[in-house]
């Protein structure tokens, strides 16, 4: 299984941060789906901790595929 993310948008406000990034997902060489991952993080004073990971699953053209094309290609 291969999940590739690209062009993350990171926003930070004090101890709160989010990362929004498109992704595509392959099962071996076979395309499965694509969508968006959203990660919410909190800084605990020492390090960033992931508090939630949310995502959606879509099919093109609703979502975009990785700009480099299929993995290994």
Where are the regions a protein language model picked out?
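Short beta-strand edge/turn micro-motifs at domain boundaries
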Residues: 36-64
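Surface-exposed, charged secondary-structure patches
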Residues: 1-32
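Short, low-complexity N-terminal intrinsically disordered segments enriched in polar/charged residues
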Residues: 67-73
